[in-house]
């Protein structure tokens, strides 16, 4: 079973995210549980929690179909201790909010060394940050997203993801989300079925499909290997349709949220319908 949706707005209340996902006939969705560009947010009220859970139940979204995303401000590998602590506290708050909402996943960008510490030290800090957050929360898996590698962002190599996972003590509560645009921009070819087979064979060898907890399905305005993060609508960018057809026909991507972050929300319903239509020839 493929769960397909988009990163929808939670404007006006978290329950609205589930409603908006249902309106585009999604079977999965992503959301921010707070303003993603602010450090602090008011605690979730009992009413907000109840309304969100009721909306998810009404529209048949289980926890495994929802992939919340944390704030863009958080840097779990920050080289400066004070800023690192601020990020860690904010991440624990994000995990706690997910726990309160009955959600089991939290997607996040791993972190940046800001040209101040070596890659290895930054990756170790990220793993330590995850360990701290997991120790203070229950039931929520930390889902590391691969990046395009802009600036000093880490996570653009599968080896980075593997190194972080290696440093996490509770392997049952860590996973990854692969963003197709980010992977392509980082130098992983996805332009044909053959290229996808090779890229995901590398992923299986280095990270392992057992850790795959979600996907972001985005075409790329950015060019191959450019390390530039620019999303595009499916089939309109430099990746093309073949990659997304291949994913929809491969059972290894079953049972996880497949989330659009493409640039035109007005055609999300069409993109979801197109993706669903590709399953007709699904192969085991």
Curated annotation (Swiss-Prot):
Natural source organism: Klebsiella pneumoniae (strain 342)
Protein name listed in UniProt: Probable endonuclease 4
Keywords: DNA damage, DNA repair, Endonuclease, Hydrolase, Metal-binding, Nuclease, Zinc
Alphabetical list of PANTHER family matching this protein: APURINIC-APYRIMIDINIC ENDONUCLEASE, ENDONUCLEASE IV ENDODEOXYRIBONUCLEASE IV
Cofactor(s) the record lists: Zn(2+)
Catalytic activity: Endonucleolytic cleavage to 5'-phosphooligonucleotide end-products
UniProt keyword Phosphoprotein present: no
HAMAP family: Nfo
InterPro entries assigned: AP_endonuc_2, AP_endonuc_F2_Zn_BS, Xyl_isomerase-like_sf, Xyl_isomerase-like_TIM-brl
Ligand binding (Zn(2+) 3): 182, 229, 231
Binding locations of Zn(2+) 1: 69, 109, 145
GO molecular function list: deoxyribonuclease IV (phage-T4-induced) activity; DNA binding; DNA-(apurinic or apyrimidinic site) endonuclease activity; phosphoric diester hydrolase activity; zinc ion binding
Role according to the record: Endonuclease IV plays a role in DNA repair. It cleaves phosphodiester bonds at apurinic or apyrimidinic (AP) sites, generating a 3'-hydroxyl group and a 5'-terminal sugar phosphate.
E.C. no: 3.1.21.2
Family statement drawn from the similarity comment of this UniProt entry: Belongs to the AP endonuclease 2 family.
A UniProt-annotated Pfam family: AP_endonuc_2
EC main group: hydrolase
Cofactor-binding details, from the entry: Binds 3 Zn(2+) ions.
Biological process terms in GO annotation: base-excision repair
Binding site for Zn(2+) 2: 145, 179, 216, 261
């Amino acid at each position: 079973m493929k769960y397909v949706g988009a990163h929808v707005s939670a404007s006006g209340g978290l329950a609205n995210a589930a409603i908006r996902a249902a309106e585009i006939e999604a079977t999965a969705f992503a959301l921010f549980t707070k303003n993603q560009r602010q450090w602090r947010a008011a605690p979730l009220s009992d009413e907000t929690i109840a309304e969100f859970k009721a909306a998810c139940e009404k529209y048949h979204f289980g926890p495994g179909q929802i992939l919340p995303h944390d704030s863009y401000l958080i840097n779990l590998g920050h080289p400066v201790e004070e800023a690192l602590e601020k990020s860690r506290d904010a991440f624990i708050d994000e995990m706690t909010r997910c726990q309160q909402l009955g959600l089991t996943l939290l997607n996040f960008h791993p972190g940046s060394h800001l040209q101040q510490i070596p890659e290895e030290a930054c990756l170790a800090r990220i793993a330590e940050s995850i360990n701290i957050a997991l120790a203070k929360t229950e039931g929520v898996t930390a889902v590391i997203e691969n990046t395009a590698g802009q600036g000093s962002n880490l996570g653009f190599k599968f080896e980075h993801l593997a190194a972080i996972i290696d440093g996490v003590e509770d392997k049952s509560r860590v996973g990854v989300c692969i963003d197709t645009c980010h992977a392509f921009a980082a130098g992983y070819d996805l332009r044909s079925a053959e290229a996808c087979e090779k890229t995901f064979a590398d992923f299986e060898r280095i990270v392992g499909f057992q850790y795959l907890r979600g996907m972001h399905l985005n075409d790329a305005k950015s060019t191959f290997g450019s390390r530039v993060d620019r999303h595009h609508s499916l089939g309109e960018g430099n990746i093309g349709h073949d990659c997304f057809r291949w994913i929809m026909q491969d059972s290894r991507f079953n049972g996880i949220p497949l989330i659009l972050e493409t640039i035109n929300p007005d055609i999300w319903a069409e993109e979801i319908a197109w993706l669903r239509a590709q399953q007709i020839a699904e192969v085991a």
